[in-house]
Amino acid sequence: MTWRQAVLLSCFSAVVLLSMLREGTSVSVGTMQMAGEEASEDAKQKIFMQESDASNFLKRRGKRSPKSRDEVNVENRQKLRVDELRREYYEEQRNEFENFVEEQNDEQEERSREAVEQWRQWHYDGLHPSYLYNRHHT
């Protein structure tokens, strides 16, 4: 029985030793993974800004300090571009409306001309010349 106890004791100690070694390697790998993640976080912080820094990036200048020449030029170019786009839009709208009104007037003139022509044909008695040639000149 003693040899069985010795074998069981050695197997048990081997299992305990292997489990400790396995935990140790997983811990060491885990710390290496953590170190890699921390390194990637540092790289991300170097590349990307914090959200608060990004929102205040263009507002670093104090309210009373004068704008730089570049800022003034950029703002003026943006304003001019917006004005140009607005002008083009309203010009296009005006042209479309003018075309619409012109077509409506042309159609109305055509309808009234046809109505006058029909009235003249209906009331022409054949005895007198038509209205165009029956003008009284003084």
UniProtKB/Swiss-Prot annotation:
Residues 28-64 form a propeptide. InterPro entries: UCMA. Disulfide bonds: none annotated. Belongs to the UCMA family. It comes from Homo sapiens. This is Unique cartilage matrix-associated protein. It is found in: Secreted, Extracellular space, Extracellular matrix. Proteolytically cleaved by a furin-like convertase to generate a persistent C-terminal fragment found in almost the entire cartilage matrix, and affecting osteoblast differentiation. One of its GO terms (biological process) is osteoblast differentiation. Its main location: secreted. Predominantly expressed in resting chondrocytes. GO terms for molecular function: BMP binding. The gene is UCMA. Pfam families: UCMA (PF17085). One of its GO terms (cellular component) is extracellular matrix. Residues 1-26 form the signal peptide. Keywords: Coiled coil, Extracellular matrix, Secreted, Signal, Sulfation. May be involved in the negative control of osteogenic differentiation of osteochondrogenic precursor cells in peripheral zones of fetal cartilage and at the cartilage-bone interface. Residues 90-122 form a coiled coil. The keyword Lipid metabolism does not apply.
